[in-house]
Amino acid sequence: MEVEGLDREEKSAGGWMLMEWVEGRTAKEVLVAGARRVKEGKGTGKAKWEEDVRGLMGKIGKAVGEMHRVGVVHGDLTTSNLMLRPPLHKTVTNGGGAASQDEEEELRIGEIVLIDFGLSAQTVQDEDRAVDLYVLERAFGSTHPEIEGEFQEVMRAYGQSYRGAEVVLKRLIEVRMRGRKRSMLG
């Protein structure tokens, strides 16, 4: 990973921890606000909203695929741990609070940034990657049921961005079956 301001010698010295303030709002905040606007008949309408959501789902799938490609699993993938960072020229914050930018525009132009890697791990196990996707799928379904059907776009984009996705997605089917069995049996 290239880090602005660090030369090659500094990066290879080891022991570095880099933190950054991520401008923007969580995907959860943007999706909840957008769904509320559609329900109230505000904004550009349901069809445009769903198109924007599909675009966001594609960005999420690509980001997760890139993370898995480098051997990292998140451990707690939810829409609360996905930030939408606006382009630099669009950044306007309100005292560290939510960005004062239209949610629809955020969906179209925002960059996905994964946050909160407290439960993350480095792994080469397809099972771990599949569990990551399963957690995101379950979290998405419970938090955003009104647009749950758009989640397939995450899987499509994941499949395009991660070369090992076919095996992971097959493993995801097994993980889902175990999850259903577990919830059925208590």
Regions found by a protein language model. Name each.
Residues 1-56:
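Conserved structural core of kinase catalytic domains
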Residues 23, 79, 119:
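Short, glycine/acidic-enriched loop or turn micro-motifs at the edges of active sites
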Residues 26, 91, 122-124:
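Conserved protein kinase catalytic core
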Residues 63-67:
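Conserved hydrophobic alpha-helix
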Residues 69-79, 84:
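Catalytic-loop of the protein kinase fold
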Residues 81-114:
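Conserved protein kinase catalytic/activation segment
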Residues 102-186:
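C-lobe/activation-segment region of protein kinase-like
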